[in-house]
């Protein structure tokens, strides 16, 4: 199996200013493409640091992916470092320079002169077009090794990495299969899977997330692809409604897909999540076909005046109650004229809890023409973790309803 190293360039990474999300994405895509990632390294914006990381990785890596350091500023030094490391020339590509300047002039009146730095191309490198930003990537084939240079911003890096992998065309020795599960502990899921896997060549990797549940990756030699498919079906039989979907699917993707399949529309009334559930849904292209809208009723006055939650309910039971979420769901469903409505109200903390309703208490209601399901859950975590867990369970509740599993 071909090996790969990932080098992330940027002082903002090693100083802890920003989270290195690129590393996770690149690891996933390289593994999916059949490459074995053997190391990840983060280095400063320094030519010698970059060169040292590259030279070290050249010893045992077939592919090296570098992200960051391709901008126009003084501290963008990845191109120069690679050229020096490989002892290759680097020169200004006039045609590329004009293309970059033309792109920038569409959005800005002034085109800085230092933008020409982004048109410096390493000898014999293939240019990777950037359709989002201004910094092109480069693909360098050198003495049997492949170096992929990508910009740092994730929205630029991700499509460019996919294009680079199409150019490289690695031949995977492994067959891989990914699955997403929700509302089942990682340990329990792992126990279920390991109890039915008796082939030592089948590898199991699980990753739990408050945002999406548990993602499982099964891998085996390519010749056993059919066995992996059979294994996945057996896992689904044993986990039932906990299975969300195959591949890199998310809860929100699954919701939009199933709403379309069932020809149902959805509206949401959010309190403690502050619009997080709605935000996740609108990340999915085509969501407007089935997701009509949402009301963030964070203050009781909005619950009362917009969603028509009665004063009696708010005074007697409080905003965090089954009675309140029931009226919130019916209120938003009537306003939006949707088939289904979800309402959530909870106590995110750190204050506001009581003995009967401690911080972390949350109520959900999903309502339809002949459907009403109310649930109370308890997530005693830090505020943003609480909101992530509530948003995820809200999406899962919609899926369960649509799948007639309530």
Curated annotation (Swiss-Prot):
Gene3D superfamilies linked: 3.30.70.2860, CinA-like, MoaB/Mog-like domain
Disulfide-bond pairs as recorded: none
CDD domains hit by this protein: cinA
Entry-linked InterPro entries: CinA (IPR050101), CinA-like_C (IPR036653), CinA_C (IPR008136), Competence-induced_CinA (IPR008135), MoaB/Mog-like_dom_sf (IPR036425), MoaB/Mog_dom (IPR001453)
Family label: Belongs to the CinA family.
NCBIfam families: cinA_nterm, molyb_syn, PncC_domain, PRK00549.1
HAMAP family (UniProt xref): CinA_B
Protein name, entry field: CinA-like protein
